[in-house]
Amino acid sequence: MEHNPKSQLKLLVTHGKEQGYLTYAEVNDHLPEEIIDSEQIDDIIQMINDMGIQVVEEAPDADDLILNEINTDTDEDAVEAATQVLSSVESELGRTTDPVRMYMREMGTVELLTREGEIDIAKRIEEGINQVQSSVSEYPEAITYLLEQYDRIKTGQIRLSDIITGFVDPNAEEIFSHSTSAIHIGSEILDNITNDSNENEDENEDENEDEDENSIDPELANEKFRELRKQYTNTSNTIKNKNRNHQDSLLEIYNLSEIFKQFRLVPKQFDHLVNNMRNMMNRVRKQERKIMKLCIEECKIPKKIFLKIFSGKETDQNWFKKEQSSNQSWSKKLEEIKEKVFSSMKKLKQIEKETGLTIEQVKDINKRMSIGEAKAKRAKKEMVEANLRLVISIAKKYTNRGLQFLDLIQEGNIGLMKAVDKFEYRRGYKFSTYATWWIRQAITRSIADQARTIRIPVHMIETINKLNRISRQMLQEIGREPTPEELSEKMLIPEDKIRKVLKIAKEPISMETPIGDDDDSHLGDFIEDTTLELPLDSATSESLRSATHDVLSGLTAREAKVLRMRFGIDMNTDHTLEEVGKQFDVTRERIRQIEAKALRKLRHPSRSEVLRSFLDD
């Protein structure tokens, strides 16, 4: 018998069709070993029954078989039925509740990319981003905002790397020297990542952690911004003197777009410009929805008719007046909503005034921007899905460091997505070469942030790792553990900071850690509670108290009370001679005499011997 599960089940169904029945033993023998759940087995048996094949405990009589032969299906029906069962069983075999297996199976359905495939996807990402930037460049406020940000650099308020990460040369050809460029970029990224680990982990800085301000030529940036400002001025003047739809204006807008696309904006700045445009579009839609709701719901204008008369005339009141003068059923009701509709139109005109664009142009820009975003997003998704295996291979090396394997995969995926955003195919190296560093950095950063019970900043983790590395090196050189003084001299770090780092590097231990082979004792049971009195001190105090009571009982009641009050025995505090005198209604001198007499009695060897032993303690 074949061991293929499909062949076994097909043979089982065919056999059942021929003899008209199957026994539970036959079904059990032909089921794949992976199916052990009772519910899955019941579902398969039910499907076999639905095909007209009885599943019984034992083989039926010959008379029953003759009756069943009347309802036996054709061979084609048997094949079709077998196919249904096979597909069902395949789904059962594929079903799993293990998230790692589900992730691996789904990841395996995506084919690996070739070098040409990577370039193709990278070009699609670039095309999508260029389309977005081209659309945003037609929004005057976007150019104004970027130029204002550059002016802030001159005053020292921000850095150049806070605005742009570089420039794109549209005429640059792809570099095919894989060996040199790959080595160069690997060391470059490693240097950037190493430098980043010593910086503050502020979210805004983290967005630009790979950017080196020295890599942006200030003179080139100044030239590019001057060119952008000049073209923006020419475009504005042309649009002002001529219509925006004039051929000269369209040419100037195109030239402005081509210059603007050369700027590689920081993600934060790019998102700001896109969100500004999107917010403007949301304001337009809000007013349009108000007008549509008034006309359709309150005046009962059919939706198709409303869209026909309203589209392209959002700020034109003539369409509304024309509908008022028409003899339609809704004409009279329009008077009731006139003020509200005109108020919304006024707000739309205000948007046109702010942007210098018509509502139709705002919609067109937003549409092209959304298409570009979707194109880039789809391409990025393809690039990420095709490189998920790379994350798995790297994450395996960081297991047993405090994070679950799935958490490592997810953190690595975040690094992979960042690598997709920053990948430059024109440099000539493969994407995996570039992405490896980002994935590794994301995983190590997450381990530093989340693996410890008490979180330690990443820059301190780097210092600890460096200290451990030098400690191992010195251990091999001098044959013993180095002292903090020696580490301070070697690392050129103050000794007090070395001691602080060594203290921080200690791992916390749970108070519930079991001690010994038995589980009845824990670490917390062996830690001294400094807030409570030690058993020995408690026993000594109790013995002293008892001995003092016995000694005082040998004095008169008056003498004993005077000593108790003067020395605070069994009282909250001691008392002065005057306070004790008031208590007994005598002078201070008399109390002093009583006290002296009582102490002389206690110094007698018969009484003092009992208390003298406590002085030794």
From Swiss-Prot:
Alphabetical keyword list: Cytoplasm, DNA-binding, Sigma factor, Transcription, Transcription regulation
GO molecular function: DNA binding; sigma factor activity
Motif Interaction with polymerase core subunit RpoC location, chain numbering: 407-410
GO biological process per UniProt: DNA-templated transcription initiation
Sigma-70 factor domain-4: annotated span: 551-604
Renumbered residue ranges of the record's region Disordered: 192-222
DNA-binding region coordinates: 577-596
InterPro entries per UniProt: RNA_pol_sigma-70_dom, RNA_pol_sigma70, RNA_pol_sigma70_r1_2, RNA_pol_sigma70_r2, RNA_pol_sigma70_r3, RNA_pol_sigma70_r4, RNA_pol_sigma_70_non-ess, RNA_pol_sigma_70_r1_1
UniProt-annotated location(s): Cytoplasm
Complexes and interactors: Interacts transiently with the RNA polymerase catalytic core.
Name used for this protein in its record: RNA polymerase sigma factor RpoD
PANTHER family in the cross-refs: RNA POLYMERASE SIGMA FACTOR RPO (PTHR30603), RNA POLYMERASE SIGMA FACTOR RPOD (PTHR30603:SF60)
Summary of the function given for this chain in its UniProt record: Sigma factors are initiation factors that promote the attachment of RNA polymerase to specific initiation sites and are then released. This sigma factor is the primary sigma factor during exponential growth.
A Pfam family hit: Sigma70_r4
Acidic residues: bias regions: 198-216
Main location: cytoplasm
HAMAP family with a match to the protein in the record: Sigma70_RpoD_SigA (MF_00963)
Coiled coil: none
